[in-house]
Regions:
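Small-residue-enriched flexible segments
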Residues: 1-58, 63-342, 346-359, 364-390
Length: 390
């Protein structure tokens, strides 16, 4: 049986914060031997202090394989700490060890090829059968084509569910932790085989102001027509509706929710920035390629809608684990959520705790999130992604 425990602490000295957090995680895990530790360390700790963080965990939990990344904030099921001096630790052990973590240096230069190499390694570690398994990656987002990297993994292991997040960091950038060191331009992957019943749930922080509409003409990243009409006319019509009046003054905060005709279910879209195209003032430019046949809805960050969507996601996750209760969770939480969305920290962890009780959960403020949408693993923004397993 797999056992888990979490702990968190805040201290300006990384070694001290990590030692306290690891001790709390170890105590929460009980008497079982801990074989793995996932560490999220506040980005206020510089490179030297990250080494101290990792030494603190290794000294407190000797023999454990330690992985993780930097973050501007961390969370557990009990709290969300928007403080760059915080450290959170998830301790895992028992008689059901996880597969060894996967690690890659140099992910920027050819992101798709680097992703494909990681995907092949994951598939080999699963003896060629990725069905029902989940790969959670933590990656330095600096100068990275994240979409290409994830696509490379999917090319090599099409049955593998991919989740995870981009690390977040301070002025010196983000770091990924492996083998007692902190690396830029790197990725660590944690494999959760089907035997652990891993599931991934995603919740949107941006809720639709409109219903999904079909893109009927597009070129590159330009939306030329929506249901046969000018996208600008569609947008102006949406903003003129009584419930949306006043939003015209904050159109810079509106985002496009891009989905597919076949998209079904709650929040099955990806959120992307958009702007009026410079070359064609009747078209919209979106921050990724689009094609005719996809759908678009205009969205806005919405605390009330985000809370309701979070509750719906948690209900879905609970139902998925009716027959196999989860033993731990990892929550990848966009840095644009928390107090930036709700006005105060801690709401998402509180909702997780209400739904799952004292389930050990650890999480980070991430630069982007990865979760399935529209039939494939996608890069997300303003989302919360919850991985449950065990």
């Amino acid at each position: 049986m797999l056992v888990a425990g979490t702990g968190a602490a805040v201290h300006a000295d990384g070694f001290t914060a990590a030692g306290l957090a690891a001790h709390r995680a170890l105590a929460a895990a009980g008497s079982a031997r801990v074989t793995a530790a996932l560490v999220f360390a506040g980005a206020r700790h510089d490179d030297d202090d990250y080494a101290g963080v990792l030494r603190g965990v290794a000294r407190t939990i000797p023999g454990a394989v330690v992985t993780g990344c930097s973050a501007t904030g961390v969370l557990t099921a009990g709290e969300e700490i928007e403080n760059a001096s915080a450290v959170a630790v998830l301790a895992l052990g028992g008689d059901q060890p996880l597969p060894p973590p996967l690690f890659r240096l140099g992910v920027r230069d050819d992101s798709r090829a680097a992703g494909a190499r990681l995907g092949r390694e994951a598939l080999a570690a699963l003896d060629g059968d990725a069905r029902g398994a989940v790969l959670a990656i933590l990656i330095d987002p600096g100068e990275l084509d994240a979409a290409d990297f994830v696509s490379g993994i999917a090319d090599a292991a099409p049955d593998l569910v991919i989740t995870g997040a981009g690390a977040s960091g301070g002025a010196k950038g983000s770091r990924v932790f492996m083998n007692g060191a902190a690396y830029p331009d790197a990725c660590v992957g944690l494999l959760f085989p089907a035997a652990l019943h891993p599931t991934v749930g995603m919740t949107q922080g941006c809720q639709g102001l409109t219903d999904p509409m079909t893109i009927t003409a597009a070129e590159g990243n330009l939306i030329l027509e929506i249901e046969g009409r000018s996208p600008i006319d569609i947008l102006e019509q949406a903003l003129s509706e009584p419930r949306n009046r006043g939003l015209g003054q904050i159109t810079g905060h509106l985002l496009a929710g891009i989905g597919d005709i076949v998209s079904v279910g709650r929040s099955d879209y990806v959120v992307r920035p958009f702007a009026v195209a410079e070359a064609d003032p009747r078209a919209l430019a979106v921050a990724e390629p689009v094609r005719a046949g996809q759908t678009i809805r205009f969205t806005l960050r919405d605390a009330i809608g985000a809370r309701d969507d979070m509750k719906a996601m948690l209900d879905e996750q609970a139902e998925a684990h009716n027959d196999a209760p989860a033993r731990f969770g990892v929550y990848f939480n966009c840095a644009g959520r928390g107090s930036a969305l709700y006005g105060k920290p801690g709401l998402d962890p509180e909702l997780i705790r209400r739904r799952f009780g004292q389930l050990p959960v650890i999480g980070i403020e991430s630069s982007f999130e990865i979760a399935p949408a529209c039939g494939q693993s996608r890069i997300h923004m303003f989302t919360g992604v919850l991985l449950l397993a065990g």
